[in-house]
Amino acid sequence: MKIGVFGSECKEDKLPVIKGLFNKLNALKSAIYIQSSYFDFLKEEFNYCPEKSDVVDNDVSGLDIVLSVGGDGTFLRTAVQIDKHNIPILGINTGRLGFLADIGSNQIDETLEELFRGDYKIEERTLLRISSENHAFGGFNYALNEIAILKRDTSSMITIHTLLNDEYLTSYQADGLVVATPTGSTAYSMSVNGPILLPQNRNFILSPVAPHSLNVRPIVIPDDYVITLNVESRTNSFLVSLDGRSEDMPVGISLKISKANFATRVIKRFNHTFYQTLREKLMWGADHRS
């Protein structure tokens, strides 16, 4: 099995976990292909070159599975690099809170053994696509978690005129608007009081950021809707953020957000559910009084 390993910079205390991961992959006789930037980091920072491994850069088409080693941010960057290649991704958590990277360091060995036995499931995660006649969004105009429209600085609010399937919804006067997928419902959207959706829900969430009116609340819409946004700003510009990748945009252009025509494939263990993740990561039901 050809396994790609993608990662990000980390502290030295994570090195034993990383070494254990590569040792297990070698014990399972996998063909290991390490993301070039991650390989360079391990070599330069820790003088560590994993045995029996090759380097992969832009061409990932020959990989069977990709391991994302880090946190949810690393997982999102990995999804960008996988693009439309339809390669399943397994998130291994060496960061902090991880909804996408939910395999803990103490679960790596047993999870990899399950992986090589084919004992796992794949969840198809919806992506958002943003388009504009005048902007290419860095060549990758998709987001797995959310697309956020935000004011550029600490100045006054922006106004976001919003249409659903060409029918006027409202004009948000706010610091911004977060359009989130079910996957992104536990990310930025949740921090601005958006609801949590199950990964299999076929919906998007529109959550205003610090709206001028307290009556303006998040709304859940079907994911086959096309969202059209037109922004007004006193600074004549605003920010568009795709999973944290931000770009300045001028006012006067029309943005369209819709469901992408492909999905990100996420590997999950059979014995672990989304409800367990919610309990563990959000500490639902925990009593800390003692």
Where are these regions (language model features)?
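Catalytic core of DAGKc-family lipid kinases
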Residues: R96-D175
